[in-house]
Amino acid sequence: ILNLARQGRGKAPWIVTAKTPSAENAKLLEEVGGCYIVLKSQAQTSEGKTTIAWLDILQTIKERGIESIMIEGGGVIINSLLSAENADLIKSVIVTIAPTWLGQGGVVVSPSRSEGSTLPVARLQRTKWQQLGDDVVLCGTLRA
């Protein structure tokens, strides 16, 4: 990624983290136009893990002039963004579905149960599907 940014073929990343990077790593990233965004605020997930709250991440990015972002990740990222506390932050979703097993031992993409009760399911509107090789891309909006 850094080489692509140096060559002018891509933009350098902004890396959001809770840990202060080494001066050397920060300098390497800044030299190509990227930066580390260190957020010390912490939140607890429903599984009891410590994380940075999505609201803090997205507000900080918005303060830097960014109105729309792409967030890449697997089932854990998708589930955390589509959870009841974060779903209002998301307008649209683009998910690549690969022909691999889902569920136990695979990628689990569904809201976790909270104290034995079910949570509302995020339902996409205005969906579009596109096959790309063996994969399928699903696009849709959560809100009108």
Regions found by a protein language model. Give the residues of each.
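Enzymes that bind and transform nitrogen-containing heteroaromatic metabolites
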Residues: 1-144
